[in-house]
């Protein structure tokens, strides 16, 4: 059926995961091409979560995790990401929660909006946490190539495929926004459950775009170095200059396509700063509160 994606694309995705992440995937059973990874958020939720079930969502985090689960009737349970913990989950805090109704935990590393990078230690902790509590970790991993020379995958943890799903997106890794080509990788059973949902929603991606995407997965190391490191480094320098002009503090080790900064104490709140910039310079800067309450002093 067309929804599963053409064999050439699935093989290219599997080869790409092996080449860059050192993860072995069966292209026939452990990969599902997506019309952009964003639709995967819908498919995974419909496949694994029933109305009234709970889902763990990061604060701050990508707003779609919250809005879509609310639409589908899931109960949102926020878990904190804080600067003093390097924007990583506080597992001691998580262990104190009642997790009996939690079905999935959304994670996103490298992180949007904070720019926190992934580590294998973090991924190992997440996999162990998932196993202890019978929770599925859904790691949204589109930014691992942006300003990052060592991309990581949660699926590199032994046994992770049993309890983890990972998204990837060519919009970010290959600078192909608008093509709407993404993927998820996990165990064969999860793929089948997700495919049952997806096959009732769409009919797959235009074949020539799949063939072109398969070719793009062969891009060289040099291509990625220029497009995803060098070009973004020049843009990052400009963004850092803006942060300095505004008096914001930020971590220069951030990766991904965003720059996250803490506003000066001289402002009452982030809205005061963003409104000032909007009206005086006619530039919109995203206020951090849209990502959650832990972002209320950030842009």
What are these regions (language model features)?
Residues 5-11:
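Long amphipathic alpha-helix in the N-terminal Rossmann-like dinucleotide-binding domain
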Residues 1, 12-15, 19:
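Glycine-rich loop-to-alpha-helix module at the N-terminal edge of alpha/beta enzyme cores
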Residues 4, 18-299:
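PLP-dependent class I/II
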């Amino acid at each position: 059926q067309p929804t599963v994606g053409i064999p050439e694309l699935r093989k290219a995705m599997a080869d790409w995961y092996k080449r860059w992440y050192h993860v072995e995937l069966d292209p026939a059973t452990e990969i599902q091409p997506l019309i952009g990874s964003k639709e995967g958020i819908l498919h995974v939720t419909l496949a694994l979560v029933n109305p009234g079930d709970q889902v763990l969502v990061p604060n701050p985090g990508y707003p779609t995790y919250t809005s879509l689960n609310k639409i589908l009737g899931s109960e949102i349970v926020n878990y904190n990401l804080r600067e003093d913990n390097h924007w990583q989950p506080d597992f001691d805090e998580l262990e104190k929660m009642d997790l009996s109704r939690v079905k999935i935990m959304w994670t996103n590393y490298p992180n949007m909006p904070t720019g926190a990078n992934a580590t294998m230690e973090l991924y190992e902790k997440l996999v162990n946490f998932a196993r202890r509590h019978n929770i599925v970790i859904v790691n949204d991993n589109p930014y691992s190539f942006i300003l990052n020379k060592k991309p990581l995958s949660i699926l590199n943890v032994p046994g992770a495929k049993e309890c983890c799903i990972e998204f990837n997106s060519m919009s970010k890794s290959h600078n192909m926004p608008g093509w709407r080509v993404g993927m998820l990788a996990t165990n064969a059973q999860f793929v089948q459950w997700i495919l049952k949902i997806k096959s009732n929603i769409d009919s797959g991606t235009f074949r020539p775009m799949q063939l072109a995407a398969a070719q793009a997965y062969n891009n060289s190391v040099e291509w990625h170095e220029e497009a995803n490191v060098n070009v973004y480094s020049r843009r990052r320098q400009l963004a850092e200059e803006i942060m300095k002009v505004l008096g914001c503090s930020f971590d220069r080790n951030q990766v991904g396509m965003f720059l996250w900064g803490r506003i000066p104490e001289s402002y009452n709140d982030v809205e005061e700063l963003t409104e000032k910039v909007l009206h005086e310079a006619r530039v919109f800067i995203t206020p951090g509160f849209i990502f959650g309450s832990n972002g209320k002093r950030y842009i």
